Amino acid sequence: MRRWNRAAARVAIAVGLVSGAVAVHAQNTAVRINVNAAADRHPINSNIYGVAYASTEELNDLNAPLNRNGGNNTSRYNWLQNGDNRAQDWYFESIGDASAVAGERGDTFIADAKAANAEAMLTIPLLDWVAKLGSNRSKLASFSIAKYGPQTGNDWQWFPDAGNGIWTSGQYVVGNDPNDANVPSSSAFQQAWVQHLISQWGTNASGGLRYYILDNEPSIWHSTHRDVQPTGVTMDQMLAKVLDYAGMIKNNDASALVIGPEEWGWSGYFYSG
């Protein structure tokens, strides 16, 4: 009999709790939300829309106002040789464009954008090294297998000597010479390119290039570009670079718009490399 009484009591308590919960919810007042889609309307700035590496035809089809030249390889673009280093994306190879004309890549990109009444956005390298080409514009490798030994991967089809920078032990190749496939870069080196762009197209105020992007994904340089930047850049170092290069650009074209740092994700703005 006691067991039955205890069980009945538990049921009664449970029912009471449920009833209480229902009663509490029943006391909530209804909320009514009205949205007036016609109120406080304003035009959306068209420059929130853009694409990357679009052709003139694609820009016209999409009616896109911005066209971005960016990505990992642009961090190592050498405007004098018109080539870049593909970094971790492709065996850390320095590869030349089809044209040997200095700055041709940027000039063609701007011309294609202007033909579609779009604005070009060019990436200016901030890394301390940019690509170097071999004789007759031949490829060069940052992690030559002949020089640094067997590695876990290589460009077996197109450039077999170009390794992936990982020894067969699984460890990263360390102590490599950046000069193997690169040359030093600085704001003075990049200033010559900015001045070339201004001489070709004018200042932003006179219809030239409007947007200069400060490099690409600096918080992961030590991964993407570990052949020339094996340690992570600190926030203080990045700030110094931004001030240096942005100041250089504005000194040459006060009307230019400088964008950066161009990061890979939100965490790049909170954590150093």
Where are these regions (language model features)?
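N-terminal secretory signal peptides that target proteins for export/translocation
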Residues: M1-A7
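Bacterial N-terminal signal peptides
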Residues: R10-G20
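Boundary at the C-terminal end of the N-terminal hydrophobic targeting segment
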Residues: A23-A26
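N-terminal catalytic cores of secreted or lumenal carbohydrate-active enzymes
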Residues: N28-G273
